[in-house]
C-alpha cells in the first residue's frame, strides 16, 4: 500500500534550557537559575529572536517574574526585515492560571497571551491580549497540548521557543511536540533529589523514551552548547497521530 507523507500542522518547537553539569535547571529551592554566562544569555536571546512565540510555565514566571526580550539591534533588524513584530508573543502556559498579577512581566513591553483551561480562563483576562483554551477531555484541569499547538499554528505561530520549566517540557515530549533541543551545560554541580531537571513529569521507560540526534557541540569558555533534533518517524496517512 502506498503511503502519503503528511505535513504536521503544528508549530516547530525548540526547547532552550541551561543546566548544571549534573543536569539540574535550578537548585533544590527552585530559585531563579542565573548560573548561565553572558554568552549563554546571548545564545538564548538569539534563539528567542527566531521564534514567533515563546512558551513557559507558570512556575517559571513565578520564579523569574519577567521574560527575556529581544534587545540586540541586529536581531531586531532581522525580525523587522522578515516582516515579524519586534518581539515574539510571550505565552504563559498554566491549567489553573494562578499567577502573580503583580509580576514585572505584566508591565514589560511585549505581547502577552495565556494558554489555559476553561477554569483558568476566568483569571487575569485583563492582563493578556489573547486567552487560548485547550482543555484535556480526561482531566479538565490540564491542557490538551495537541489541540493547543494546532490553535497556535492556525494563528500563524509557526516557530516556538520553549523555555521551561521541566513539567512543561515533559508534557510536550509526551505529546510528541518537541522538534529540537538546545542544552547549555554550565560548570557547576547543584545536586539534590528535589532540584528540577530539564524534563520532569512521570518520566519515560527506556524502551519508549524520545530519541535524539546530536546536531552540534559548541564549547564556549567553560560552557558547552548541545543541539539535538528529536528523531521521529515521517508522518504518513498510515501513522497519522490521532
Regions found by a protein language model. Give the residues of each.
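Enzymes that bind and transform nitrogen-containing heteroaromatic metabolites
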Residues: 1-242
Amino acid at each position: 500500500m502506498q503511503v502519503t507523507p503528511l505535513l504536521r500542522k503544528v508549530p516547530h518547537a525548540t526547547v532552550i534550557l541551561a543546566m548544571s553539569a549534573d543536569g539540574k535547571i535550578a537548585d533544590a529551592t527552585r530559585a531563579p537559575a542565573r548560573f548561565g554566562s553572558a554568552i549563554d544569555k546571548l545564545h538564548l536571546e538569539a534563539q528567542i529572536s527566531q521564534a514567533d512565540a515563546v512558551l513557559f510555565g507558570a512556575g517559571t514566571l513565578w520564579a523569574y517574574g519577567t521574560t527575556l526580550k529581544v534587545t540586540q539591534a541586529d536581531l531586531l533588524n532581522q525580525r523587522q526585515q522578515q516582516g515579524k513584530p519586534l518581539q515574539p508573543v510571550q505565552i504563559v502556559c498554566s491549567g489553573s492560571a494562578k499567577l502573580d498579577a503583580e509580576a514585572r512581566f505584566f508591565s514589560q513591553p511585549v505581547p502577552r497571551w495565556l494558554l489555559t483551561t476553561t477554569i483558568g480562563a476566568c483569571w487575569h483576562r485583563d492582563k493578556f491580549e489573547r486567552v487560548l483554551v485547550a482543555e484535556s477531555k480526561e482531566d479538565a484541569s490540564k491542557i490538551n497540548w495537541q489541540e493547543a499547538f494546532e490553535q497556535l499554528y492556525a494563528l500563524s505561530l509557526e516557530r516556538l521557543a520553549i523555555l521551561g520549566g521541566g513539567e512543561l517540557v515533559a508534557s510536550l515530549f509526551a505529546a510528541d511536540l518537541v522538534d529540537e533541543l538546545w542544552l547549555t551545560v554550565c560548570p557547576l554541580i547543584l545536586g539534590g533529589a528535589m532540584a528540577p531537571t530539564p524534563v520532569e513529569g512521570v518520566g519515560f521507560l527506556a524502551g519508549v523514551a524520545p530519541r535524539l540526534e546530536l546536531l552540534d557541540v559548541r564549547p564556549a569558555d567553560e560552557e558547552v552548547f548541545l543541539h539535538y533534533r528529536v528523531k521521529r518517524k515521517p508522518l504518513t496517512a498510515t501513522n497519522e497521530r490521532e
